Swiss-Prot record:
This is Ribosomal RNA large subunit methyltransferase H. Its EC number is 2.1.1.177. Keywords: Cytoplasm, Methyltransferase, rRNA processing, S-adenosyl-L-methionine, Transferase. It catalyses: pseudouridine(1915) in 23S rRNA + S-adenosyl-L-methionine = N(3)-methylpseudouridine(1915) in 23S rRNA + S-adenosyl-L-homocysteine + H(+). NCBIfam families: PRK00103.2-3 (NF000989), PRK00103.2-5 (NF000991). Homodimer. The keyword Transmembrane helix does not apply. One of its GO terms (molecular function) is rRNA (pseudouridine-N3-)-methyltransferase activity. Specifically methylates the pseudouridine at position 1915 (m3Psi1915) in 23S rRNA. S-adenosyl-L-methionine binds at residues 76, 108. Belongs to the RNA methyltransferase RlmH family.
């Protein structure tokens, strides 16, 4: 199963990008041994439309254009379900075992995600009730994906 993060906005050079890349690379090393075919991050350009609904619609269209048939869509949203690390790992493991071709994680822009896009998601996740900057959400998601792989592998990184 291939994993893809679609993130609205760019992650500029700096410590956040370095940390994000570190977790992505760590996952690639371990994930391939677990039957995952890689983890990619694609950045979606932020819409320049004047009104929030138009911005969300443009960004949603760009996101949907990159979601392959048969893939599981997971949105990151403050209204989503807060999953513990072991539950998240178990879910990724189930999708892998069911031979889902891909899991697509979507991180919205400043206006959030279009409601129609959120409804298409098989899972909507949150990192608690707080609103996080998309740069931090990307790093946190990459860390949780790496942590999930370590849980599935029985690696000591996750000690809870």
């Amino acid at each position: 199963m291939r994993l893809l993060i679609l993130a609205v906005g760019k992650l500029k050079q700096g410590p956040e990008r370095e940390l994000a890349e570190r977790y992505r690379a760590r996952f690639d090393d371990l994930g391939r041994k677990l039957g995952f075919r890689g983890l990619d991050v694609h950045e979606i350009a932020e819409s320049r439309a004047r009104e929030a609904p138009a911005r969300m619609a443009e960004e949603a269209a760009a996101i949907i254009a990159q979601v392959p048939d048969g893939a599981v869509l997971v949105t990151l949203d403050e209204r989503g379900q807060s999953l513990g690390s072991t539950a998240f790992a178990a879910q990724l493991g189930r999708w892998r075992d069911e031979q889902v071709p891909g899991t697509i994680f979507v991180i919205g822009g400043a206006d959030g995600l279009l409601p129609e896009l959120r409804r298409k998601a098989k899972l909507s996740m949150s990192f608690g009730g707080a609103t996080w900057p998309h740069q931090m959400v990307r790093v946190m998601l990459l860390e949780q994906i790496y942590r999930a792989a370590t849980i599935l592998a029985g690696h000591p990184y996750h000690r809870a």
